[in-house]
Every structure is written in structure tokens, then in C-alpha cells.
Amino acid sequence: MWRHGLRVTEAVSMRRDQINLQRARAWIQRLKNSLSVEQPIDGEELRAIKSYLNTRDDKLPWLFVSERGLPMTRQAVNYLIDEAGKRASLEVHPHMLRHSCGYYLANEGTDLRTMQDYMGHRDPKHTVRYSRVAGRRFEGLWKK
């Protein structure tokens, strides 16, 4: 969820056919009238997805399934993230992963248009919020 800036519903709605393991690409079907986009899958992430799919002996279309073979639910994701937060003594919620992706991209100096496309925002005003707090954007400003 973090690496692709996914909303919980976008993550639990993903299907196997949205992942192209040979090309290391994921089709991200955005919600809320956002723009869908194909994104690269990085090495570590690609290995984790392959490993996860190799443990499954089903032909279910969903990428993420419960132990009962049903699609993962929003509630299950909320629970898992809440429990992980408790173990780390942090108060977290799933949408923080999406926001963290935006802040990370901004701090890495990603241009606003690329961030907008990556996050699936139709309106740049939703993307600007991430760059506004990116302190690194001022580094080297006067070194020319």
C-alpha cells in the first residue's frame, strides 16, 4: 500500500491480472474519480509478490485473500495495521500509508506532475499538500 500510495479499497480490490510479473508492473485501478496508472514493481516487492503467490494453491482472481479464500476486506486491513501499530506503540491507520507515500515522493524531490500522476490525483491541489511540508525542497536553493 505504501509504495504505490494505495487506498485500502484499492489494495483489497486488486486482482491477480493487475500484476504482470514478467514486466514487473502493476496496474493500479484508482478510486474516487482518480486516474488509474501502470506502476513499476521494485525488486524486493516483486520477490515478495512472487513468494506470496507461490504459497497459494488456488485460482482465485483476487490478489489478497483471507485464510478462508475470500477477498481481503477493508476491516481486515484496518485490523492488521492497527495491531502492527500497537506492537510498535504507534497510533496508525491505513490511510497514513498513502500519505506517507506522497510525503516520501515530495522529500525525494519528485516533481509535482509526476507525483500527481503516481498518486492518481486529477486535481493538483490534492498533490500540493505533500510538497508544502517537504523541507528538503529548499536544500541547495542558494547554491548556484
Go through the PLM ranges and name each one:
Residues V37-P40, R132-K144:
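DNA/chromatin major-groove-contacting recognition/catalytic segments
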Residues I19-L21, T73, L90-E91, D111-S131, ...:
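Short, polar N-cap/turn motifs at the start of nucleic acid-interacting alpha helices
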Residues R15, A106, M119, Y130-S131, ...:
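DNA major-groove recognition helix of helix-turn-helix
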Residues Q39, N78-D117:
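Short, basic (Lys/Arg/His-rich) helix/loop patches that form interaction surfaces
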Residues M1-S13, E108-T110, H121:
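A short, glycine-centered helix-capping/turn motif at helix boundaries
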Residues H4, V8-T9, S13-S51:
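Conserved tyrosine-mediated DNA breakage-rejoining catalytic core shared by Y-recombinases
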Residues I28, I81, T127-Y130:
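Mobile genetic element proteins and their domesticated derivatives, centered on retroelements
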Residues D42-E91:
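Active-site/catalytic core of tyrosine-dependent DNA strand-transfer enzymes
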